[in-house]
């Protein structure tokens, strides 16, 4: 997320008094804090910082961070469906990366087309409160966490990662549908973004978006 707090507030129509402090970051990693937009109890939008990744408890193994929810699981999985029905959110972004190859991987950064160098968009996501350990036999924590949805890749993404891509939305009407619409209408947004409306803006060994945009 290379864009400023002010840019996020404008696009996602969040009042300054309903927004937490946040600064542009060249990359966001699982388990770390990132800004998301959700509806508060009074129905107004708010920008808050949550930890990336739901936590899946596993027998005899350490808890696992799950950062993405598949579109073919979100309606049927007990792990995801309650959050999809009751706690949807928008994850602001200006780019995202996918690896190609390994040892070392080449990281390809994708952005949507627009007049700006890195136009803002959102990953439709879900959030919840997690109370429990993050490590095997570790102490319990109390965190609000989020994950975002993935779907089948478009042609551009499939050239790098043939398995999945995040769902992207950039239309303000779709923001409202995801936050407040019915589950049926929200699920209609679970589609791959048009390949011709995206581009690869950077590739190489860096796992950070090297562009700094206000």
Which residue stretches match the model-derived regions?
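Short linear sequence motif anchored by a di-proline
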Residues: 1-214
């Amino acid at each position: 997320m290379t864009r400023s707090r002010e840019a996020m507030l404008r696009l996602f129509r969040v009042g300054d008094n309903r927004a937490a402090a946040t600064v542009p970051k060249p990359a966001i990693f699982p388990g770390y804090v990132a800004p998301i937009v959700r509806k508060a109890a009074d129905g107004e939008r708010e920008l808050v910082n949550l930890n990336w990744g739901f936590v899946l408890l596993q027998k005899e193994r350490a808890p696992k961070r799950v950062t993405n929810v598949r579109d073919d699981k979100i309606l049927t999985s007990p792990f995801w469906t309650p959050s999809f029905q009751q706690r949807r959110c928008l994850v602001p972004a200006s780019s995202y990366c996918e690896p190609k190859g390994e040892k070392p991987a080449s990281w390809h950064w994708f952005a949507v087309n627009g007049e700006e160098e890195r136009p803002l968009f959102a990953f439709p996501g879900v959030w919840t409160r997690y109370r429990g350990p993050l490590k095997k036999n570790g102490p319990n924590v109390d965190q609000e966490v989020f994950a975002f949805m993935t779907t089948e890749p478009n042609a551009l993404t499939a050239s790098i990662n043939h398995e999945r891509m995040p769902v992207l939305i950039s239309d303000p009407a779709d923001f409202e549908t995801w936050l407040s619409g019915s589950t049926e209408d929200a699920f209609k947004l679970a589609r791959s973004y048009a390949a011709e409306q995206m581009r690869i803006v950077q590739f190489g060994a860096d796992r950070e978006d090297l562009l700094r945009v206000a």
